[in-house]
Amino acid sequence: GGYEEDYLKIPKDVLTTTMISHQKYFPVVNEAGKLLPYFIAVSNTKPRDISVVAKGNERVLRARLADASFFFEEDKKVPLEDRVESLKKVVFHTLLGTSHKKVSRFRKLAVKIASKVKPSVKKNVDRAALLAKADLESLMVGEFSELQGIMGREYALIAGEKPEIANAIYEHYLPIVAGGDLPQSDEGAIVGLADKMDTIAGFFGVGMPPTGTADPYALRRQALGIINIILSRE
């Protein structure tokens, strides 16, 4: 099936997430890896008329992409920094306060780490930490939670932030899975370390460490992330 080329104006990650995660479709790209306005859907039945099935899938995808396009355009109207204040309404954990408080904590820690290991990036680190969670209040991340960080990077670039700051917003979530990609920039590594350290210290501090059978806040993964980030740096 296919969809309108206008939707290619939406960030690629939004389109592929919609197709792969939500609709279980295969996006189509050209030889250079550029997304094309087509998709492949797989059916476990043999339809009488494949064109009817294709049109049905196109209709469903268009509705999803129309929503994504609306979210993207609406989100762009609010500068990323303006969303930071809204994090006061987002509860990180009842015992650890709001996401705004969490940002305040790990922002200070990130600046201290930068001062010790790479003073030249301290300003970028401070700015990236401030904006790191701002996209949680966006319509797009509200609908597609797996795009947190990715949309933060996009909206930061749209707002005119330095590429190093925008990239650090994305990278601070890495690694997303055990053995996954690690931050490549100093800014992303430092903000990521501070965020993960704050999470681990916070939950241990309120008496909620992982147990042999449960780790609901992925603290082990966060700890492994810290170790791997440190080992990956020169």
Language model features: what each stretch is:
Residues 1-234:
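Amphipathic alpha-helical "coupling" segments that flank catalytic cores
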